[in-house]
Amino acid sequence: DLLIIMLGTNDVKERFGANAACIGAGMERLIQKCKSVDCWGGKEPNILIVAPPRIKEGFHDEVMGDGCVEKSRGVAAQFQMIAARNHVHFLDAEGCEFNQIDFMHLTRHGHAQLAEKLAELVPTLL
């Protein structure tokens, strides 16, 4: 079994008031909760966390707010550090294509790119 957790780009919205470290702390809490659930048959769960692609430079809108580009840059580094500390796997989805409407949701091609990355990595983790 493999549990895959990917927090979305929405977490960098200004209204949530979370910086990359806070978003990372949220991911770490999720990992710890997943590990504490009694459904793994007495074994340590096999977990993969995925960092979303970074929001591209110059993007700003009312929904995301100021600082979303900068905050999104720090999430992958936080997730990578948290993955190492919690002995779980890490994948950076950077390079998967965002749509040009809200710059936070993947396009059809972006989903295919993420699927390719996962298809390559997941068999090595099972």
Predicted regions and their residues:
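Alpha-helical cap/lid subdomain in secreted, periplasmic
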Residues: 1-126
